[in-house]
Amino acid sequence: MQGTKNNIYTVSRLNGEVRQILEGQLGKIWLNGEISNFSSPSSGHWYLTLKDHSSQIRCAMFKGRNQTVSFKPINGQQVLVKGAISVYEPRGDYQLLIESMLPAGDGLLAQQFDALKMKLAAEGLFAADTKRRLPKNIQRIGVITSPTGAAIRDVLHVLARRDPSIEVIIYPTQVQGETAAQSICQAINIANQRLEVDVLLLTRGGGSLEDLWCFNSEALAHTIYNSALPVVSAVGHEVDTTISDYVADIRAPTPSAGAELLSQDSDNKAQKLATALSRLQQSAKHYQLKQERRLSLLEHRLQRQDPKRTLQQFEQRFDEMQLRLESALSNRLHILSRRQQLLASRLEQQSPKHKLAIEGNRLSYLASRLQDALQDKLSQSEQRIKYVAHQLETVSPLATLSRGYSITTDIHNQVVDSTDKLTIGDSLQTRLRHGQVISTVTQIKPLE
């Protein structure tokens, strides 16, 4: 519908309506692809991308769902997943919310198994009111299995131990391979034509899903359903479940358990208990199938109002914010580390040790200059002293004496420079260049 000015969408409204359209129209789907960008944060949720040769889609599998997966996904692995398309509104991204995950090989078989189980359940082949009761006094048991397998040995051993009077008729058949389902159908039909036994025990030992696949045949399911003889299905181990288990009148978890179910002990309590338990299991499985269909319908109706979906989106957004926060913290720590290194370098340059080294070098330089300056000053002073000494020597009395003059002083060591200071009889000292002369004034002659 074209928008108008009176019908302007907000981004949130647009994403919300896109989510409702996608979730309402597609419902639950199966998807096959290769895993990439797998991550498993501390919340326990799984986030991944499924891709093929030309396209990819983001997926999320929340903790409550992925705990049922029997393997840890890895990048590059081919898987088959079941889920519902949703829109992560905060980003406007559409994604697949995964409910179950299987390896690609087993996954395709499991998908076919689920599809056939739903189809046959809808047709009423599993209905509890169609199940036949076992005869009260079983005399002959028809065993439909391989005559050379471990299952027939287990069955014969249990029957011989519990009730040797029971007669066993073996209807040999294949129990594995492409033609095994047809072979089993023929054996059941032969037993119904002969009507020589009281009950049929369909059995084989355990194996993989592929090994047991012949017991998941639609044709075999209808053959068991149409059998006039009651059928007990005892295929594989206790964890193995096949279509034949759902259609049969009673399901036993193992071949030995099937033999015990059909044989009586002294008080017959085991048979009664096993029969009641088997019927209870069948009723529970039928009820479970009915409730699964009802639950699927209710889930589809409640998708738009599912608070769990909203919570899951918040959890996914929280995981993304946590990853962004961890990245931001890492970048911040890197920046702080660089800044710390820079400050450490600057602190090293400002440290007393560094300054002392610089000042020590400067002091050595100044000491050298001071030494040179003192040497220059001493040299200049020496030259000055020599010059002054020379000048002093020039005017010194000693210099006068060296030129042939003498100096006369009285007894008081006063220089006599005039006869006015003398009287007859005064003692005089005359200083010559070399030595002194002591004399007495005997005559005074004034200057003419």
Curated annotation (Swiss-Prot):
It comes from the Bacteria. It is found in: Cytoplasm. GO terms for biological process: DNA catabolic process. GO terms for cellular component: cytoplasm; exodeoxyribonuclease VII complex. It catalyses: Exonucleolytic cleavage in either 5'- to 3'- or 3'- to 5'-direction to yield nucleoside 5'-phosphates. Pfam families: Exonuc_VII_L, tRNA_anti_2. It is an enzyme of class 3 (hydrolase). Keywords: Cytoplasm, Exonuclease, Hydrolase, Nuclease. The keyword RNA-binding does not apply. GO terms for molecular function: exodeoxyribonuclease VII activity; nucleic acid binding. Its main location: cytoplasm. Its EC number is 3.1.11.6. Belongs to the XseA family. HAMAP family: Exonuc_7_L. Heterooligomer composed of large and small subunits. Bidirectionally degrades single-stranded DNA into large acid-insoluble oligonucleotides, which are then degraded further into small acid-soluble oligonucleotides. This is Exodeoxyribonuclease 7 large subunit. The lineage of its organism: Bacteria, Pseudomonadati, Pseudomonadota, Gammaproteobacteria, Alteromonadales.
